Each structure stands twice: as C-alpha cells, then as structure tokens.
Amino acid sequence: MTTTRQAEFDQRYQTHLKHLKLKGLQPKTIEAYSRAIRRMGEYFDWQIDALSSSQLTDYFSDLVATHSWSSVKLDLYGYKFYTQHVLRKPWGMPDLVKPPKTQRLPDIVTVEEAARLFAATRCLSYRVFFFTIYSMGLRLGEGLALRLGDIDAARARVQVRDAKGNRDRLVPLPAPTLSVLRRFWQIHRNAQWLFPSRQGGAAAAREARLPLDRGGVQTTLRRVVQDCRLKKTSPPTVFATAMQLT
C-alpha cells in the first residue's frame, strides 16, 4: 500500500516540478518549493492531497520546533503552490502561519575590512570576483552570472540580468573595477564569462563553458572571513549592501 501511495505521490511531485519550471521561478525557489513537498510527503506518509486544517496545524507546529521561520514560510508557499497548480484547488488558509515580524540590518563590510579580505584571498579569480561584487554592490549570484556582453564600458555601467524578482537592472561601473576586470580578462580571455570556471586550472579557463562554482566561492569567502577574524553573520552576502569603492 505504501509503495502505491509513494508512486502516486512521485507522479504528482513531478507535475509540481514541471509547473515550477513553467512559471519561470528562480532555481533556488524551485528547490525550496520542491523540498517542501518532499518533506510534507514523508511526514504524511505520501498523502498530502486532502490535508485538513488540523493536520496542517500539527505539521507546521512541528516544523517551527525544528526549523527556522524561513523554512516554515517556504514550506507554506511550496504547499500553496502545489495546492493551486497541481491539485487545482483554491488556497483557503491565508492565516495558517504568521511568522514574527523582524527587521534586521545586513552586515556591512567597510572599505578597510574589504581591503583585508582582498589581500587575504590568494586565488586571483576569487580576489577579482570579491572586489567586483563589493565595488558594485552585487549579490553573489548576480556576480557569477556576469558575461562580457553585460559590460558597457562606454557608459560605465553593467547590466545585471535576472536579478532579484527576475528583473534586469543597470548598475554603475566604477573606473577602478573596469580596470581590474580588463586586466583579469587579459589573463583568462574567455569569450563568454566574466568569471569562468576554475575547473581544469587557469589553462582551461579560456574554454570554460560555466562560470565559477557558487559553492567554491562561498567556501573561500567564509574561510577568508574567518582568517581575517571579521565577525560577520552572513559572509556570502555581506558585499551586496556595501558602499561602492569609487
């Protein structure tokens, strides 16, 4: 019986994935919403299509006790999406979960701290990458996605594609950053990516078809932050709110 239930669940889960992709959601959102359905499936023995209000209350009460409010919200949004797009039912529980309202200011890396981070980053690719996202106030994913065609040197600006909210935006390009990027490109000469993958070493960067690996960037940044003894709570994203180096 359980095997049959799981098979039926798996079929609807695949439909869920298809709808997520067809809606043009960001990869991280797709992963979060799909993880929510997998987690709920395991909790309810693969039967999540006709959950009562009390069942959902029990589930989210247990989830609050073991996960962050961020995870709780994502599971709620994931199940809401599943209900509306896979089950084709209206969502009738808007007040099921209400996380406490908090407003935290992000950590800011000062110019002096940034200089220490750059100096402590031994790998040239990472050092230039960190300098670029700091100087332009970019998110990590936005920096990784930069291509040569996004650079408008004449107008001193960069087009950031598919930024937060799936919107493109224009960002000022400081002269020091343009100079650094030009010198860096002379080294790797990749025809597509501003920060090509390091897999295969420097010699392979010219032909790389992918950008730098996100995990490698995050690991390096965390290590450098620790080496510099900076007490920042979110090292992968601290650059996104920093002041520009001009």
How does the language model describe each region?
Residues M1-T246:
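Conserved catalytic core of the tyrosine transesterase superfamily
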